C-alpha cells in the first residue's frame, strides 16, 4: 500500500540525542566546502558532499542501530536516490523546513542547506521523470453532499437543500471530498429519498401532503440594526432563499424571540412585522402587547400566533424576508451584551422585537405546473402528438440529455435503458410528466451519477501510468474548480478529444475560474483548509467575551471568504494571502477591529494602513477564534495551525493522556501562557512537538481568543509575543511571523499547492507527488505565484492528467 505523503514523522525524527558527538550549543557551522581537507568534503555540491553533510549532522542519531524516528541514513546510497525515494523525500522536507538538526544543536549554514536540498531534489526529480508515478485515485468516489447539491443545481437548475437527507461527509487528509466508494443499504435509502425529492421538484409534481420548512435564527444573533438585503428603514429579521416546489398557495408564519419565561422581548407597544417575497411586500402585520399585563414582558403564548399569511407563489427559487419597520422616533437603546441568549435574558433584554423562526408550509391549492427554470432545463422537448411513439421519442431525448450531463460522458442506448423502463412503467399509470419524473429519479439513483468513476483502459499493463480520458479530465476539472459536474462546453470538448490539448485546457481553466461557480473554491476548499467550517461550533465563553455573537461569527467567516475570493477572482499572488494591505468588513466587524468610518451590514473592501495588524490571514478573526479555546488563547492550537497550513510541516499526533496545563505555580501565582508552555515543554513526552509548535503560536499572543488586539493577557500580565519557527528564525508578533514566512515564500506556496492538489485529486498526496509539487511551485515563481499559475500547474501535472493502473 502506498505511503501517505507528507509523512508525519515521529517526534524523535527531529531530535538529536544529548549524548551525540556533535558539539553542544546552537552555533552555525561554516559551509562544508570551506572546511579543511580532513573533513573529506568537496567544494562543489555532489554525492560526496551530500554524504559528508549527512554523516556530520544526521547519522549520529539516524543510523541502522538507533533508527531514531524509524530512519537510518547510514545505509542508504546517496548516489542512487530512486530505490529509496520515499526516505529521501522525508529528508528533503526536513531540510527545506530547517527542522533538523533541531534548534540548539550545530547546524549547517544556509548555503549548505540549500545545496544539499537542491542536489537531492534534482536527483529525485530526474528519477521521477524516468519512471513517472502519477498515483492512483479511487475507482469509485462517492459525491459529497456539496457536490451532489451543486450537481442538481447545474443539471436541473434546481436549488434543493439535501443536508437533511444525506449524511455528513467524513473528512480525510483535511478535506471531505477524499472519500471512498462505500454505499451501505442505509446510505442507499438516503440517496433514493433525495432522488425522489429532487425529481418531484424538478418536474413540479404535487406533494402527497403539505410539508413545512422552518428557519430558526441563532439565539445569539443581534437584530437591533438594519440587515443587508432587507428594505431601508427596517431593523432585524431575516432574509433567506427558498425553492417553492410547486405553483401553489403557501403559509408563511413568524415566531418572535422570547426570554426564558416565554415572554416576547421588546414588545412594550404595538409594532409592525413585514413579510415580503423577492423584495415585494406581501403583508404588514401588527403585534400588540397583552392588555392584561403590565411591564415590559407579556407571558402570552398566543401573542404572535396571528403572524402568518397565505399567498400564492410560483414554483422555483425565491427570497423570503421578515423584518420590522423602524419607528419614526428613536428607541432608547441599552448596551445589550450580544452573547449567548441565556446570559442576556432579564439582565440585558432586547429592547426591540426579534425573529425567532420563520416557517413555510405548503403547498395548498396547487395549480397547473408552470415553466420553472428546472422544467425549462429538463424538458428539452414536448411530444409533438399525443401518441405513444411521439412521447417515447421525446422521452428518450429528455433522458439522453439528462443522462449525458449526470453521467458526465456520452451515453449509449444501454445507459438509458433502465431510466426509460421506469418512464414507461410510470407512464402506464400516469401522464407524460409522471413518467419523466420516474426517469429522473432513476438517473439520480444511478451509480453513474452518485459516483465519480474512473475506468482503466483495456489491455493496460498492471502498475503502469496511463493518461485519463478527456471525459474523466473534464470531471476532474469541474469537481476541482466548481465542486460540480462539467457543463456542456466541457463535455463537448471532451467528446471531441480536444480538452486535453494544452491551449484548450488553459482557456477552459481560465474560463472556469472566472465563472461564478468557482466560488466553490472558497466555500469548500478554503473553508476546510482554513478551518472556517469550525466557526459554527465555536462558542467563546459568554462571561469573558460578552461582545461575541452570531453576527460576529458570520462576519468572521464572510471576511475570510471574500478575501480568498478576491485572490481567486483578481488572480492575485498567493503571497497576498499573507501580505495583503486590504480586507473586507461590515460595521460589526469594523468596530471589533477598531477600523473607523464603516457603517451598515454590507461588506466592503477597506484599505489597511502600513501599521495595521489585520493584513493577511494572520489578522483574521476567523482563524484566531477557531484556534483558541472558549476562555483563552491557545499557542498550541495556533502553532499547530501555522505549521500544518502555512509551513507544511505538521507535527505528529499528540500522545495519549496529555496532562492539562497548570494555571498556577506551587505558591498559587497565576502563570502566564508562556510560563505554562515552558512547563509543558519540560515533559519529555511533550517537548519534541511543542518545541516546534509553541514559538509560532506564542507570536500571535497579541490577539485574544476572539481576535481582538491586546497588550495584556487574561491574567493581566503584559503580552510577550516573541516567537520563532522550526528553521531557527526568531521574531516578535504576527508581523514578524509574516515577514519570516515571506522570507522563504516557496514553503508557504508549496504548502498551498499541496492542499490544492489534495483537494483537486481527491486523495492524499504521496512521496511520489513531491516532484510535481516542486515543478508547480518553480513554474509559478516566474509569475509571482499568481493563483491561476498554481491551478494551471496542478491541472497540467502528471498526477492530475494521469493515473496508475492497479
Identify the function of each model-found stretch.
Residues 1-8:
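Positively charged n-region of N-terminal signal peptides that target proteins for export
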Residues 2, 21-71, 83-90, 94-99, ...:
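Low-complexity, glycine/serine/threonine/alanine-rich intrinsically disordered linker
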Residues 10-20:
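Bacterial N-terminal signal peptides
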Residues 74:
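Short, aromatic/basic-rich helix-turn unit that serves as a nucleic-acid recognition element
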Amino acid at each position: 500500500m502506498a505511503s501517505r505523503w507528507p509523512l508525519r514523522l515521529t517526534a524523535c525524527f527531529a531530535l538529536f540525542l544529548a549524548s551525540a558527538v556533535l558539539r553542544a550549543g546552537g552555533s552555525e557551522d561554516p559551509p562544508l566546502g570551506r572546511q579543511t581537507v580532513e573533513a573529506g568534503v568537496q567544494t562543489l555540491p555532489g554525492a560526496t558532499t551530500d554524504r559528508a553533510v549527512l554523516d556530520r549532522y544526521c547519522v549520529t542519531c539516524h543510523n541502522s542501530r538507533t533508527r531514531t524516528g524509524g530512519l537510518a541514513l547510514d545505509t542508504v546510497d546517496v548516489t542512487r536516490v530512486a530505490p529509496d525515494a520515499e526516505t529521501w523525500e522525508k529528508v528533503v522536507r526536513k531540510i527545506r523546513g530547517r527542522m533538523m538538526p533541531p534548534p540548539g544543536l550545530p547546524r549547517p549554514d544556509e548555503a549548505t542547506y540549500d545545496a544539499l536540498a537542491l542536489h537531492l531534489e534534482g536527483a529525485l526529480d530526474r528519477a521521477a521523470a524516468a519512471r513517472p508515478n502519477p498515483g492512483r485515485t479511487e475507482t469509485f468516489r462517492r459525491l459529497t453532499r456539496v457536490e451532489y447539491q451543486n450537481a442538481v443545481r447545474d443539471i436541473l437548475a434546481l436549488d434543493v437543500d439535501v443536508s437533511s437527507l444525506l449524511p455528513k461527509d467524513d473528512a480525510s487528509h483535511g478535506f471531505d471530498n477524499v472519500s471512498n466508494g462505500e454505499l451501505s443499504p442505509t446510505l442507499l435509502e438516503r440517496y433514493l429519498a433525495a432522488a425522489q425529492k429532487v425529481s418531484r421538484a424538478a418536474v413540479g409534481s404535487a406533494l402527497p401532503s403539505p410539508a413545512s420548512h422552518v428557519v430558526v435564527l441563532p439565539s445569539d444573533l443581534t437584530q437591533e440594526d438594519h440587515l443587508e438585503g432587507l428594505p431601508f428603514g427596517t431593523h432585524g429579521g431575516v432574509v433567506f432563499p427558498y425553492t417553492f416546489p410547486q405553483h401553489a398557495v403557501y403559509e408563511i408564519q413568524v415566531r418572535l424571540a422570547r426570554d426564558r419565561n416565554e415572554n416576547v422581548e421588546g414588545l412594550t407597544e404595538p409594532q409592525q412585522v413585514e413579510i415580503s417575497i423577492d423584495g415585494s411586500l406581501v403583508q404588514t402585520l401588527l403585534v400588540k402587547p397583552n392588555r392584561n399585563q403590565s411591564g415590559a414582558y407579556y407571558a402570552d403564548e398566543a401573542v404572535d400566533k396571528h403572524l402568518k399569511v397565505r399567498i400564492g407563489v410560483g414554483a422555483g427559487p425565491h427570497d423570503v424576508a421578515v423584518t420590522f419597520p423602524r419607528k419614526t422616533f428613536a428607541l432608547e437603546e441599552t448596551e445589550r451584551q450580544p452573547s449567548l441568549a441565556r446570559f442576556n435574558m432579564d439582565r440585558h433584554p432586547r429592547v426591540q422585537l426579534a425573529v425567532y423562526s420563520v416557517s413555510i408550509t405548503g403547498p395548498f391549492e396547487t395549480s397547473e405546473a408552470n415553466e420553472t427554470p428546472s422544467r425549462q432545463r429538463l424538458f428539452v422537448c414536448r411530444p409533438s402528438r399525443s401518441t405513444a411513439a411521439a412521447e417515447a421519442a421525446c422521452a428518450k431525448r429528455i433522458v439522453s440529455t439528462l443522462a449525458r450531463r449526470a453521467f458526465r460522458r456520452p451515453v449509449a442506448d444501454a445507459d438509458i435503458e433502465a431510466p426509460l423502463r421506469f418512464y414507461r412503467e410510470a407512464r402506464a399509470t400516469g401522464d407524460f410528466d409522471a413518467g419523466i419524473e420516474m426517469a429522473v429519479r432513476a438517473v439520480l439513483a444511478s451509480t453513474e451519477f452518485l459516483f465519480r468513476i474512473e475506468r482503466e483502459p483495456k489491455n493496460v499493463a498492471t502498475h503502469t501510468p496511463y493518461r485519463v480520458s478527456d471525459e474523466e479530465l473534464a470531471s476532474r476539472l469541474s469537481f476541482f474548480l466548481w465542486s460540480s459536474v462539467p457543463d456542456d462546453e466541457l463535455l463537448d470538448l471532451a467528446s471531441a478529444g480536444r480538452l486535453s490539448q494544452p491551449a484548450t485546457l488553459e482557456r477552459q481553466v481560465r474560463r472556469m475560474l472566472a465563472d461564478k461557480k468557482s466560488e466553490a473554491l472558497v466555500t469548500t476548499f478554503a473553508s476546510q483548509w482554513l478551518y472556517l467550517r469550525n466557526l459554527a461550533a465555536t462558542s467563546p465563553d459568554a462571561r469573558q467575551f460578552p461582545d461575541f455573537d452570531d453576527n460576529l461569527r458570520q462576519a468572521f467567516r464572510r471576511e475570510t471568504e471574500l478575501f480568498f475570493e478576491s485572490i481567486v477572482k483578481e488572480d492575485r499572488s498567493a503571497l497576498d494571502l499573507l501580505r495583503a494591505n486590504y480586507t473586507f468588513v461590515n460595521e460589526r466587524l469594523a468596530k471589533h477591529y477598531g477600523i473607523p468610518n464603516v457603517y451598515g451590514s454590507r461588506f466592503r473592501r477597506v484599505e489597511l494602513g502600513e501599521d495595521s495588524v489585520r493584513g493577511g490571514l494572520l489578522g483574521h478573526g476567523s482563524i484566531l477564534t477557531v484556534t483558541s479555546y472558549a476562555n483563552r488563547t491557545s499557542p498550541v492550537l495556533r502553532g499547530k495551525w501555522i505549521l500544518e497550513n502555512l509551513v507544511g510541516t505538521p507535527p505528529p499526533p499528540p500522545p495519549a493522556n496529555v496532562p492539562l496545563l497548570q494555571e498556577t505555580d506551587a505558591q498559587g501565582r497565576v502563570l502566564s501562557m508562556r510560563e505554562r508552555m515552558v512547563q509543558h515543554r519540560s515533559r519529555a513526552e511533550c517537548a519534541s512537538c511543542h518545541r516546534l509548535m509553541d514559538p509560532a503560536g506564542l507570536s500571535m499572543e497579541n490577539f485574544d481568543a476572539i481576535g481582538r488586539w491586546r497588550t495584556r493577557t487574561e491574567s493581566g500580565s503584559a503580552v510577550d509575543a516573541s516567537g520563532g519557527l522550526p528553521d531557527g528564525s526568531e521574531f516578535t508578533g504576527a508581523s514578524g511571523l509574516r515577514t519570516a514566512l515571506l522570507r522563504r515564500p516557496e514553503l508557504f506556496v508549496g504548502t498551498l499547492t499541496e492542499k490544492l492538489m489534495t483537494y483537486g485529486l481527491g486523495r492524499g498526496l504521496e512521496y511520489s507527488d513531491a516532484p510535481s509539487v516542486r515543478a508547480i511551485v518553480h513554474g509559478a515563481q516566474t509569475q509571482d505565484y499568481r493563483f491561476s499559475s498554481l491551478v494551471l500547474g496542478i491541472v497540467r501535472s502528471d498526477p492530475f492528467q494521469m493515473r496508475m493502473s492497479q
